[in-house]
């Protein structure tokens, strides 16, 4: 049986049930193809990721991810990425965790990246300075050396995005696409932040432990 660990990266600003379901659905699918998932890792980005005023400090975000995963027996929060002083490329985060996972579980354990379809759609995004948000060679390595699992998201079309990229389109068949048939959700961190600012309830869209942390620290009151 093949063994892998799953990595989810992102702002987690705040973490939602959709983030947790993404990992759960990925694991459930892998189990049907004779693959054991030994661990799930949620890695928030560092504060240097961007200068958006909505991105709260990483010390708050990592604590929320810890709260969100507290009851899980296989998903954990990791602060390596978010405590670095500079932004870290996803490929380097994967390499870091693969090394640690193999030390912990054995050299045969692989590492796979789990993302939403909206992240794949960002593969072709051009930044204001004209540079690419994603490096094509990084994407190629993620797909061929690690493994990419994509959860379908509302309004995203990851397959079309991949097919539009000459450097990686030939690897479409290596990407695992999954869909949450049990609990499809349009919940997002953006919607939660807006709801909090507008004094609306976010109960059941994120674990109660996260809600309590947000309330205790007076987070997202202004956007």
From Swiss-Prot:
It comes from the Eukaryota. Pathway: Cofactor biosynthesis; NAD(+) biosynthesis; deamido-NAD(+) from nicotinate D-ribonucleotide: step 1/1; Cofactor biosynthesis; NAD(+) biosynthesis; NAD(+) from nicotinamide D-ribonucleotide: step 1/1. ATP binds at residues 19, 190-191. Its EC number is 2.7.7.1, 2.7.7.18. One of its GO terms (molecular function) is nicotinamide-nucleotide adenylyltransferase activity. NAD(+) binds at residues 11-12, 87, 90, 116, 118, 133-134, 153. The keyword NAD applies. Keywords: ATP-binding, NAD, Nucleotide-binding, Nucleotidyltransferase, Pyridine nucleotide biosynthesis, Transferase. The keyword Nucleotide-binding applies. SUPFAM superfamilies: Nucleotidylyl transferase. One of its GO terms (biological process) is NAD biosynthetic process. It catalyses: beta-nicotinamide D-ribonucleotide + ATP + H(+) = diphosphate + NAD(+); nicotinate beta-D-ribonucleotide + ATP + H(+) = deamido-NAD(+) + diphosphate. InterPro entries: Cyt_trans-like (IPR004821), Euk_NMN_adenylyltrnsfrase (IPR051182), NadD/NMNAT (IPR005248), NMNAT_euk (IPR045094), Rossmann-like_a/b/a_fold (IPR014729). Its cofactor is a divalent metal cation. Catalyzes the formation of NAD(+) from nicotinamide mononucleotide (NMN) and ATP. Can also use the deamidated form; nicotinic acid mononucleotide (NaMN) as substrate. Belongs to the eukaryotic NMN adenylyltransferase family. This is Nicotinamide/nicotinic acid mononucleotide adenylyltransferase 2.
């Amino acid at each position: 049986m093949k063994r892998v660990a799953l990595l989810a990266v992102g702002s987690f600003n705040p973490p939602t049930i959709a983030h947790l379901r993404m990992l759960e659905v990925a694991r459930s699918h892998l189990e049907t193809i004779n693959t054991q998932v030994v661990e799930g890792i949620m890695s928030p980005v560092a504060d240097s990721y961007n200068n958006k005023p909505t991105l709260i400090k990483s010390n708050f975000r990592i604590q929320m991810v810890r709260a969100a995963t507290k009851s899980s027996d296989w998903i954990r929060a990791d602060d390596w990425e978010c405590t670095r002083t500079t932004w870290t490329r996803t490929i380097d985060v994967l390499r870091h965790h693969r090394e640690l996972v193999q030390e912990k579980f054995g050299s045969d354990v692989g590492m796979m990246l789990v993302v939403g379809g909206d992240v794949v759609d960002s593969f072709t995004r051009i930044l204001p300075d004209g540079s690419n948000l994603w490096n094509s060679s990084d994407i190629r390595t993620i797909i061929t050396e690690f493994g990419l699992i994509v959860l379908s998201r509302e309004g995203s079309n990851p397959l079309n995005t991949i097919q539009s990229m000459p450097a990686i389109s030939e690897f479409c068949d290596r990407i695992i696409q999954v869909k949450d048939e049990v609990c499809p959700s349009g919940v997002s961190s953006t919607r939660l932040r807006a709801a909090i600012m507008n004094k609306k309830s976010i109960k059941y869209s994120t674990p109660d432990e996260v809600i309590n942390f947000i309330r205790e620290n007076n987070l997202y009151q202004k956007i």
